[in-house]
């Protein structure tokens, strides 16, 4: 048996997509892609330049934050985006787009955003890798010399354990039959029509 996949992958971002992007769909909807919170020379600099370019550009009443395939990273890197989106959420609606490749710091970031008003998560359940992990890749050989273990060096909060291995379920699930951003735009327009 082989699972039949669609010709077009609507769930994941294309491999060659930029890590950071801001664009407007129309006057009512803006889109923000953050594909990493990693802190290394290349991504930290790119993230800071990108952040500086967008920090005064969030104007639409609806905002899609695309965290699909976000590989996680450092809390310090996510903090600036959280502050920006927290301020924005007081006047606009946030739609957080997630998939099974949204993990680690992206999941923690999502839980923080969910505490704000006007936030809806959409997509699919996240990876469930937010309490344990290794930033430094330290291995320890056991006394027998036969086995080696890979230790966690992260201090996860007990409140995050409920999501470990299970992930964060979205408020609204999306199907894999059509473009996910277009599905979110449809949700926004439908909600706008009810107001």
Segments predicted by a language model, with ranges:
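C-terminal "exit" segments of structured domains
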Residues: 134-158
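Short, intrinsically disordered/low-complexity patches at protein termini
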Residues: 88-89, 144-146, 174, 186-188
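A short, polar/proline- and glycine-enriched secondary-structure boundary/capping micro-motif
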Residues: 42-44, 160-163
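Low-complexity, Gly/Ser/Thr/Pro-rich intrinsically disordered linker/tail segments
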Residues: 161-195
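Generic "edge-of-domain/loop-turn" microfeature
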Residues: 39, 72, 103, 147, ...
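Cleft-lining beta-strand/loop regions that shape enzyme active-site pockets
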Residues: 1-141
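Pocket-edge structural micro-motifs
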Residues: 33-34, 98, 123, 144, ...
